[in-house]
Amino acid sequence: MPHDAVVIGGSYAGLSAALQLVRARRRVLVIDDGRPRNRFAARAHGVLSNDGRPGFEIAAAARAQVAAYPTAAFRMAEAVDATRIDDGFSVAFADGSRTMGRRLILAHGVEDVLPDLPGVKERWGRTALHCPWCHGYEVGGGPIGVLGRGDHAVQYASVVAEWGQAVLFIDPARLSEDEARMLARRRVTIEPTPVERLEGEAPTLTGARLVDGAHVRQSGGFAERLGCEMTDTPMGRIVKVDAQQQTSQPGVFAAGDLARPAGNITLATTDGMTAAHAAFRSLIEEETA
């Protein structure tokens, strides 16, 4: 018998979706490969009632709560493909096995594409960061370097300036007069010299902390192979969804970072709940048609 829903991704969005569905007494399988996007950060911040708690602890507590319901199932494995079949969807695993679900919720997140800069990888999530809302309070108060990559660099630097002495590494010729004036009002320093490497003994960093709005790429490619419509954002390509987290493909829902240009734990859990409610309603409609 197929699951009522298969959730690919067992972090905040996926667990939130699963919790709603198992509370509706629906059979749910959560698939997770154990590699959450925030695994490089020591703590999660800005999460109501969990501010400063390690992200893996938040996820572990959520997983235990979901697992307490008898209709919940988990599989720690890598999903490699998802296809539509007559009764719903078939999900393939790396070992060649398959499982089936009447609805599919994609919550596997995205991967940060780091700048090609020596020293970034070993500092990522500690002193080389991507989200001022997540880490700005802890690293603020001193100089904060911002890599001037992409069209969103100027806006990003103006936001980062709230937490410290922002230094934007960018060719001044790329700035319009309005942008230059706005950065000056925000007291952002323009540094034309390109950053060649990060120095210091990792994960520490000599001088300024580094913030970069690293763009993202979809993990797994499930949405595109299923024919879901995608949309381009300054942060990268994401799955296009409506207000109910429904993709362009019937029966396929997307929640969390893979379906929004900027994410955090709170937004991911909200998306997961919304997707679960929509998936539940679609099951009811099918069963009563």
Protein language model features and the residues they cover:
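Internal hydrophobic alpha-helix adjacent to the cofactor/substrate pocket in enzyme cavities
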Residues: 18, 22-26, 166-172, 267-289
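Rossmann-like nucleotide/phosphate-binding core characteristic of flavoprotein oxidoreductases
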Residues: 1-4, 198-201, 261, 277-289
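FAD-binding core/adjacent interface of flavoenzyme oxidoreductases
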Residues: 1-5, 73-141, 211, 239-243, ...
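FAD-site-proximal beta/loop scaffold in flavoenzymes
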Residues: 122-138, 218-266, 274, 281
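Beta1-alpha1 glycine-rich phosphate/pyrophosphate-binding loop at the start
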Residues: 3-57, 142-143, 148, 154-174
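Residue-level detector of alpha-helix initiation sites
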Residues: 11-12, 112, 151-152, 259-260
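Active-site glycine-rich loop that binds ribose-phosphate moieties when present
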Residues: 126-133, 143-156, 176-177, 191
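A Rossmann-like FAD-binding core segment of flavoenzymes
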Residues: 60, 66-86, 91-92, 98-101, ...
